[in-house]
């Protein structure tokens, strides 16, 4: 049997993601498609290492919104709780609002706009997405180590949860 050191890529990763159904707002097919792709991509390739739990994974992640906070419920693959982190939604509000506005522009543009205009809108969309991803990495610092691509995929999922949580 091969031993892998703590912190190796086989253990510091997410193998399953669930979203709190009560936290998910109604969204159109474009957002639902983006959510499904983000979950698939996240599970396929990620770096996710809760502080103090190196080598304890792989992990499952349940995302939701509770008491107007973003909830990361992290468990071992067998369901044993590892840690739950609650993050303020405040740092994400403007970014998510801007992201949804530019996504609406993008989805409208792909139906009628020129390729140059679509590309310009998409560059703006990616820039806002990157900003949200960096903000998430900063908010998770000292709690969960994630790489930038993992943070990008998690930010996509946060956008799905965010608006429903606003009304709670």
Curated annotation (Swiss-Prot):
InterPro entries, per the entry: UCP032146
Pfam families from the UniProt entry: UPF0262
Family note: Belongs to the UPF0262 family.
Entries under HAMAP family matching the protein: UPF0262
NCBIfam families: PRK02853.1
Name of this chain's protein: UPF0262 protein BRADO6636
Organism: Bradyrhizobium sp. (strain ORS 278)
Highest classification ranks of the organism: Bacteria, Pseudomonadati, Pseudomonadota, Alphaproteobacteria, Hyphomicrobiales
């Amino acid at each position: 049997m091969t031993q892998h050191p703590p912190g190796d890529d086989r253990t510091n990763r997410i193998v399953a993601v669930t979203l709190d159904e009560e936290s998910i707002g109604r969204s159109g097919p474009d957002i639902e498609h983006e959510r499904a792709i983000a979950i698939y991509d996240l599970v396929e390739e990620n770096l996710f290492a809760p502080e103090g739990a190196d080598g304890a994974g792989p992990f499952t992640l349940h995302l939701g919104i509770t008491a107007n906070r973003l909830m990361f419920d992290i468990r071992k693959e067998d369901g044993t709780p590892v840690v739950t982190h609650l993050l303020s939604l405040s740092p994400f509000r403007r970014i998510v609002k801007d992201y949804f506005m530019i996504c609406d522009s993008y989805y409208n543009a792909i139906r009628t706009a020129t390729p140059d205009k679509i590309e310009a809108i998409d560059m703006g969309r990616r820039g806002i997405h990157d900003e949200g991803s960096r903000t998430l990495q900063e908010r998770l610092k000292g709690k969960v180590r994630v790489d930038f691509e993992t943070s990008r995929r998690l930010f996509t999922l946060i956008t799905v949860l965010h608006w429903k949580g606003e009304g709670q």
